[in-house]
Amino acid sequence: MHFLIPAAGSGSRMKAGKNKLLIDLEGESLIYWTLKSVFSASSTNWVGIIGQPKDKNLLLNSTKDFAHKVHWINGGDTRQQSVFNGLKALPKDAEKVLIHDGARCLINPELIDLCAKQLDENEAVILATKVTDTIKIVDNEGFIKETPDRNYLWAAQTPQGFLVDRLKKAHKMAIDKNWNVTDDASLFEMLNWKVKIIEGTYSNIKITSPIDLKIAKLFVKNP
């Protein structure tokens, strides 16, 4: 399985003053923990890290023994552009790809393998968890408009897996139509292409704030 990891997080909400994937988690960088999980998955055979050139040396150095196993890909101005750069950098024989947020460093390798396996039967899959909170849709003035049925609500995670040719086509169409999305599954939705949900775990959090880092430390100490 080919694997792409967007790794351009600025760390502004973490107040880190550097790429957040360089932040320490129990003695190792976040990107190190992410790669440890990715390479622990039996389906992984090629990994590309997509980041900004200024971060290249620091990120690769922080991955330690994994540095010689990954391929560096220069990112774009947005996550969407960066993923498209990653798709163009894949080996010509790549048929399937998993895309995973670099800041989701607690991903279970077995879930990675499950996503890879599900691509044998689906052209697009994503990890997600059932929403347990009551969600409110509000208007521009902050008043509640409606409460959607949470039985139909899922919180999207990564990895998100796709057939490479299909995802490339979706990205090219997004460029032509000037679409801007926050994840790749959204492109498939806009094109009315099916995306299969695979139930993930609540531990697969994205590190975006100091409280997330504290939670991640608990999971690392108590796997």
Swiss-Prot record:
InterPro entries: IspD (IPR001228), IspD/TarI (IPR034683), IspD/TarI_cytidylyltransf_bact (IPR050088), ISPD_synthase_CS (IPR018294), Nucleotide-diphossugar_trans (IPR029044)
Alphabetical list of SUPFAM superfamilies matching this protein: Nucleotide-diphospho-sugar transferases
Protein keywords: Isoprene biosynthesis, Nucleotidyltransferase, Transferase
GO biological process: one example: isopentenyl diphosphate biosynthetic process, methylerythritol 4-phosphate pathway
Site (Transition state stabilizer): R13, K20
Pathway: Isoprenoid biosynthesis; isopentenyl diphosphate biosynthesis via DXP pathway; isopentenyl diphosphate from 1-deoxy-D-xylulose 5-phosphate: step 2/6
GO molecular function list: 2-C-methyl-D-erythritol 4-phosphate cytidylyltransferase activity
Residues marked Positions MEP for the nucleophilic attack (site): R150, K206
Similarity comment: family membership: Belongs to the IspD/TarI cytidylyltransferase family. IspD subfamily.
Protein name, per record: 2-C-methyl-D-erythritol 4-phosphate cytidylyltransferase
Organism name: Prochlorococcus marinus (strain MIT 9301)
Gene from which this protein is expressed: ispD
